[in-house]
Amino acid sequence: MIRLQTYAAFSLMATATAVYYAFSSREQFYPAMVYLSTSKICFVLLLNTGLVAMCVAWQLVKRLFLGTLREAEVERLNEQAWREVVEILFAVTIFRQDFSVSFLAMVAALLLVKALHWLAQKRVEYIETTPSVPMLSHARIVSFMLFLLVVDCLFLSNSLRSLIHKREASVAIFFSFEYMILATSTVSTFVKYIFYVSDMLMEGQWEKKAVYTFYLELISDLVHLSLYMLFFIAIFLNYGVPLHLIRELYETFRNFRIRIADYVRYRKITSNMNERFPDATADELNASDATCIICREEMTTAKKLLCGHLFHVHCLRSWLERQHTCPTCRAPILPPDNGRTAARPHGVHPGVQPVPGNGTPGSERAAGENISRRQAKLEAAASAASLYGRSFAYPPANNLNRYSTPPQSTSNGPQSGEASTSNQSPKGHATADPSAPTFYARGAVSSVTTTRELESSLQKAYENAIKSQIEMLQIQLQMFQHGATSSATNNENGEHTKSD
């Protein structure tokens, strides 16, 4: 601000000197004005003074409605300013036929008005995340947004009148479009602020706030996308490819597509929340921390995710509007593909279904724990097998020794007879250990014989790998021994040479 004051003072002094010289040398008003408008030095000084006046007015508006800017607001202002200047330069190349002093003044005014809009959006975000905001700040931000809306409407009406008066494509299309975008952004920011105030008056208990905010942003992106497309077509038909609109058009389309995808995913997840996420029992609430980490309040009733964490149903619904992962462990919450997906245990892949009757309580307790590296390899192999139509999956490596040799039974006592009898199926086939994981893929059950063949082949592969490692170690040992013998021989020869 001090540098602006100094620059403004020097600019005002230079302009006053030029005006005094023009009137003192010409002595009449009309010749003096002709001299000021035709002299290049005087013309540049007058333009500079006009720009300084606009900057001073911008500083006064900012100080009146916002006060001192925060560091985040200054950073946002600097980042957006450079991008906007580059886009304005591209726009100037498109409308070079309409280039004039008034066009430069309108462009400078547009940049300053856009900067005020960026600050307003950032200040509203700051107010929404601040616990206690004084009433003066609320009054200033409301009056500031109303002031911006009035300015947008005035510039928009001026551009539309110019466009209607000329009845042809001109630079007025550019300013009409820009101020229309700014006006819709101001309305969206103001409505979002109203949502915040309503939630604050309800002491943070307005459950529909996130839903309404999401719909507001969706409608705002749709309106902006429609305006960008219309303006792109209008400029393309009359002037050529508008390079300054390509980035904005792409970003708006990407944001709109992401919001549509989030909305569809949210509807899929919340359409059957009662069936997909069961209610937590009293024992589960007592066994775990009964505090919802979303709202930090005690839970009397809660929903249980597949990962085992508990949340309020309304907190979970509001969380799913923005995120699709567990708030605690960040495990993904995917929408159900069919009715059976909701009942699938955690950690089992869609193409791999567990055998009925083999589920144990230990598997439920281990659902929230981190899986080991070998189990991750097993799940990856099972998924690959299901994708390629295989009917088998490799068991964990810690079960290979258990299945590498068939169970042996003796007739030394009755217990041995019972064990041998219990290890046979009704058809006379030996069954595997109940703790061993059995997999289904595409409805086909892998037999015990196939499992044993896979186990034996994998065991042989391990044995071959170990043998090759042993051979390499033996070769390295021999080379080391040979090197040690050679060094000892060289040392002895050196000692004999010294003694001789």
UniProtKB/Swiss-Prot annotation:
Q: Is NADP found in the keyword set? A: no
Q: Which SMART domains match?
A: RING
What terms describe the molecular function in GO for this protein?
ubiquitin protein ligase activity; zinc ion binding
- What Pfam families is this protein classified in? zf-RING_2
Q: Where is the composition biased (Low complexity)?
A: 348-358
The zinc fingers classed as RING-type run over 292-330
- Which Enzyme Commission number(s) are on file for it? 2.3.2.27
Q: Say which enzyme class the record assigns.
A: transferase
Instruction: Give GO cellular component annotations, separated by semicolons.
Output: endomembrane system; endoplasmic reticulum membrane
Biological process terms from the Gene Ontology for this record are:
ERAD pathway; proteasome-mediated ubiquitin-dependent protein catabolic process; protein ubiquitination
- Pathway, per Swiss-Prot/TrEMBL? Protein modification; protein ubiquitination
Query: Topology in the membrane?
Result: Multi-pass membrane protein
- Coiled-coil regions listed: none
What keywords are assigned to this protein?
A: Endoplasmic reticulum, Membrane, Metal-binding, Transferase, Transmembrane, Transmembrane helix, Ubl conjugation pathway, Zinc, Zinc-finger
Catalytic reactions of this protein: S-ubiquitinyl-[E2 ubiquitin-conjugating enzyme]-L-cysteine + [acceptor protein]-L-lysine = [E2 ubiquitin-conjugating enzyme]-L-cysteine + N(6)-ubiquitinyl-[acceptor protein]-L-lysine
Q: Where is this gene product found?
A: Endoplasmic reticulum membrane
Q: Where is this region: Disordered?
A: 337-375, 398-438
Which family, according to UniProt? Answer: Belongs to the HRD1 family.
Name used for this protein in its record: ERAD-associated E3 ubiquitin-protein ligase HRD1
**What is the organism field in this record?**
Oryza sativa subsp. japonica (Rice)
